Amino acid sequence: MNHYPECTCQESLCETVRGFSAHHPDSVIYQTSLMSALLSGVYEGSTTIADLLTHGDFGLGTFNELDGELIAFSSEVYQLRADGSARKARADQKTPFAVMTWFRPQYRKTFDHPVSRQQLHDVIDQQIPSDNLFCALHIDGHFRHAHTRTVPRQTPPYRAMTDVLDDQPVFRFNQRKGTLVGFRTPQHMQGLNVAGYHEHFITDDRQGGGHLLDYQLDSGVLTFGEIHKLMIDLPADSAFLQADLHPDNLDAAIRAVEN
């Protein structure tokens, strides 16, 4: 039987519940390529969706040619497209950048009142205060609003991602049930991944979603856990090998494209 000790969290949001995984093996984050490569326009990879699912049942990323956002949970992968729609991804589709794990949450918190994105993050940060660890988080619930963007499909010659997002479509899903998948990445990993919180959303009918810019949860269940291990597959193609992976404006550029 799992033991669920109580803890106190800021502004009585609390009783974050220690959960599920005292006896589970350590989770590992699997990542294909680098965020800095995506930022510089490396939009084609050789890793398939089928490959990703051998490394985890939960994650996020994008698709070749930057054709929308990727969200994965319960071993199902969806493509969140530039028109705001969503569809199930094919096993043979490929990704230039994705992050996956076997989701083994350690904590659970039920919300029966509205909370902001920042308040949700505060719950996680208080329970796992060290910024030197990865966290994976999942929410199933009713969202008062979910403000998203997606990236439009690109064609060669590829522009840098900061230029692509000048054309990004944005959407607002109001009063919708849905699923959030996200990671909190340490600041020292900026460039390898996206430092801070990176979250994707899909509606419960699996017909729409995107990369989250902001949201408010009316009610739902948050599960999350810390991850201590990271494995990265680096591409060997010429686009990656010739890319500038550490430009002077790396941190500012990533913050601009993600937020």
From Swiss-Prot:
Pfam families: AAL_decarboxy. Pathway: Polyol metabolism; (R,R)-butane-2,3-diol biosynthesis; (R,R)-butane-2,3-diol from pyruvate: step 2/3. Keywords: Acetoin biosynthesis, Decarboxylase, Lyase. GO terms for biological process: acetoin biosynthetic process. One of its GO terms (molecular function) is acetolactate decarboxylase activity. NCBIfam families: acetolac_decarb. Converts acetolactate into acetoin, which can be excreted by the cells. This may be a mechanism for controlling the internal pH of cells in the stationary stage. This is Alpha-acetolactate decarboxylase. It comes from Raoultella terrigena (Klebsiella terrigena). The lineage of its organism: Bacteria, Pseudomonadati, Pseudomonadota, Gammaproteobacteria, Enterobacterales.
